[in-house]
Amino acid sequence: MENAVYVLLGITSVVCVAVIGWRAWMLRWNSVVPPELVTALADCRSREDAKNVRSLCEKNPSPLGRLIRLTVDRLDWPKDDNIDSLETAARHEIVHLERGLVVLEVIVGIAPLLGLVGTIAGMMTVFGDLGQTGLNDAAKLAQGIALILRATLAGLLIAIPSLIFWSYFSKKVEVLAVEMETLCDEFIRRQYRK
């Protein structure tokens, strides 16, 4: 039983590292909010400029680029309808940015529990053996208890970094979402000036 727990903890740790690497790569600031697009948005003053921005969005796909491209495509819509459409698309982009974070959240919960299951299974084995042989060798008992507590330690060593990165990535998604919202809002305000 303890071996199965260690295998599950090993799989959990590999998944944790993979998700952390994947999200770190996907949530790079410059890939979500490309600086060249931010500059183009700041320089965009007319509907003619908006066509150039749209072209830039097509060449450099990013969450911000997809939102701006959608907005440019709907500039002939009434402002409120364009904003509603943008808000819906933004929610989809945020869900896309949050992808994988639930895996880290689950690992935070299950890794310590898997460790605890390993510890309990090991304790049952140690005390079962103790019941059969008696308490003749206290050092052997202490070694057995130390060995089985490693499962709890392993679970915690997986859960703690998972919690740290889950918190970090969740906050980063929030900050990126606010930045995209601000840039889109400024762009729409300039395009619908009367």
Identify the meaning behind each predicted range.
Residues 6, 139-166, 170:
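Pore-lining and gate-forming transmembrane alpha-helices of multi-pass membrane transport proteins
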Residues 31-117, 121-135, 165-194:
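Predominantly long cytosolic amphipathic alpha-helical stalk/bundle segments
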Residues 8-21, 107-117, 158:
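Lipid-exposed faces of alpha-helical membrane segments in multi-pass integral membrane proteins
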Residues 1-4, 93, 97-111, 144, ...:
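Loop-to-transmembrane-helix entry motif
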Residues 1-37:
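Hydrophobic membrane-targeting segments
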